[in-house]
Amino acid sequence: MSLTNQNSKSKAAFERALPLMPGGVNSPVRAYKSVGMTPIFAERAQGSRLYDIDGKEYIDYVLSWGPMILGHADPIVTAAIQEQATRGWSYGTPTEIESAMAEVVISRVPSVEVVRMVNSGTEATMAALRLARGYTGKTKILKFEGCYHGHGDSLLIKAGSGVATLGLPDSPGVPAQIASMTLTVPYNDMDAVRIAFEKHGDDIAGVIVEPAAGNMGFVPPQPGFLEGLREITEQHGTLLIFDEVMTGFRVGFNCAQGHFGVTPDITCLGKVIGGGMPVGAYGGRRDIMEQIAPQGPIYQAGTLSGNPLAMAAGLATLTQLKPEHYEEFDRKANRLSEGYLAAAAKYNIPLTTNRAGAMFGVFFTDQPVTNFEQAKSSNLDMFRSYYQKMAARGVFLPPSQFEGLFLSTVHTDDDIEQTLAAVELTFKELQLEFNR
């Protein structure tokens, strides 16, 4: 099958970019190394569709890696950005729209009584760890294998996302002294968590976790896992931090914590809350958040934090989301899962799917995937071929086995059926290619 972008404007654009930026990109997964392709260079996007610079049209399940929950170029969000831009886009002094945005976040996220806006998910998680250490007086952080919390030094230990995509165990440049303050255990493994607390419980400031992991593929929590984390952290005076940068307002109307019924002490947000603009946030209990400067002694600041354009886009996004959207997400994700599994059974393709809300994951393995080691058992050669064939058929997927798919409010039933038709043809070819 011809991959049209391999001898195209995208190829020329990538060759131009290669000497200008590390690997030709500004974020590693965009290099498409793990799928053996030249990157698809976008020209524009509208609704559920993305168009490359050759004019090829794709059904988009990347959605800018999650933020575009209303689809691309939503007219209400577009109008909000344009209206704000006519009045300026950065002032260096407070604006009323920051309070309006904070009110919506606080009303929707069960754990958040006070919120601080920042510029990215990485900033949010870095600030949350500093806050946990400052509040508790403890130093160690417990995280989970395959969970990605941004590129802060102390969180690049056995991380997922692009780190897993490129096959990197950790990152050079992280001092051993910093790495030693991060404890790592398998996701969904409460026995391992208990052992870590038996050894280090008096010194663990925070447990940071994706309440549904989206950076080792999509892996939801097993029954009792989040509840177990809540219980053990309360027993030890440790703060529970939910990294909802990806799951926030995607897994549920009240985020993953509302969907699963477990309330952390601190929540990190990003992606959807900016409507596609650079943004992050962290919030939590009032007594914890009051420790942040200028109210308290724990310092964190940002020139562009609470940027009016980002606040306008985020507010216009969140106010359009309704509980019934999540019922539709569940229905469409269920149809995708059924269709994928039916095609896999028909053509003897090893496949497991996971889903929750507007997130969906596919693994080329017969075994259930509940942690990072199981995710890594997926057949990467098969994924690479699947990715290339689906792209050629006009379906834009995350170019990594270790990333999940995203749905938007504007993905139609016809989009889903077109996608499953492409899956059917692709799996038929995979059966022949891999002698299934």
Swiss-Prot record:
Q: Cite a single GO BP annotation.
A: protoporphyrinogen IX biosynthetic process
- Documented EC number(s): 5.4.3.8
**What keywords sit in the KW lines?**
Cytoplasm, Isomerase, Porphyrin biosynthesis, Pyridoxal phosphate
For this record, an example GO cellular component is: cytoplasm
Any coiled-coil regions, as ranges: none
**Top EC group:** isomerase
Give the chief site where it resides: cytoplasm
Q: What is this protein called?
A: Glutamate-1-semialdehyde 2,1-aminomutase 2
Q: Which organism is it from?
A: Exiguobacterium sibiricum (strain DSM 17290 / CCUG 55495 / CIP 109462 / JCM 13490 / 255-15)
